[in-house]
Design a protein with these regions (language model features):
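Formylglycine-dependent sulfatase
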Residues: 1-246
């Protein structure tokens, strides 16, 4: 985690109000040239399934992102959800941050805590401390199973690990048509939509865009970090009919 030092008071306290001078610390801002950062994570998806890496599967939108963004082709992934997320968000080996396996398991040993160790900072915590707005919409799977009920504790939920806002689900999987959802630190009911008109992937994108628009509408100069970890390519495999017909 990133701990913020308490700003030293630089005003003056006199015997009267006239003799005193208030002090308001400046808000942290990364500067005008700081870029917006968007990370999209697809669950249980191999690189050979993407058109930009030679697949025959139509992934035109993903291909456009790859062609117009950055490709990081030397990242170590595991065939498990939580370890890859822990490594991606910390930039460190999953073993060194307490996540050798999925967060469902806690062994009582430092390499498998069921969450990212508090001695490691996430990229969201680092950017948040530098003045970024930070948003997460999607699958978390970085908190112990026993700690994700409505009663908490909330110390390993997204808002405690560097994100200003969260919309998504905390476990490893959820029904894509009738998901179990959390907003910030509160469990909510799934949106009431007509059968066949709702899919979680679209909802996640819509909610993330709302977060960004809300932030930019009030502080347009503030850059954002958006983390969008989809859950659709993980079990249960539930695609909209238009994709099943292909």
């Amino acid at each position: 985690m990133v701990t913020q030092p308490i700003p030293e008071f630089q005003g003056r306290i006199g015997r009267t109000l006239e003799e005193s001078e208030p002090y308001f610390p400046a808000k942290q801002h990364p500067g005008g040239e700081a870029p917006n950062v968007v990370i999209i994570l697809m669950d249980d998806t191999g690189f050979a399934q993407l058109g930009c890496y030679g697949s025959d599967i139509d992934t035109s939108h993903i291909d456009a992102l790859a062609n117009n963004g950055l490709r990081f082709t030397n990242f170590h992934v595991t065939p498990l959800c939580s370890p890859t997320r822990a490594a991606l968000l910390t930039g460190r080996s999953q073993h060194s941050v307490g996540m050798r396996s999925v967060s469902n398991h806690q062994t009582g040993f430092p390499h498998q805590l069921g969450h990212i160790t508090n001695h490691a900072a996430t990229v969201a915590e680092v950017l948040q401390s530098e003045g970024y707005a930070t948003f997460c919409a999607g699958k978390w799977h970085l908190a112990p199973t026993n700690d994700i009920s409505a009663a908490g504790p909330f110390d390993q939920w997204p808002l405690a690990r560097g994100f200003d806002r969260f919309y998504g689900f905390l476990e490893g999987e959820t029904d894509q048509f009738h998901p179990e959802l959390v907003v910030d630190n509160q469990h909510i009911d799934a949106p009431a939509k007509m059968e066949g008109s709702y899919h979680l992937s679209e909802d996640l994108v819509d909610q993330l865009l709302k977060m960004i628009n809300d932030s930019k509408g009030i502080r347009p100069d503030r850059p954002f970090f958006a983390y969008l970890p989809f859950g659709a390519t993980h079990a249960p495999h539930q695609a909209p009919d238009e994709y099943l017909r292909k």
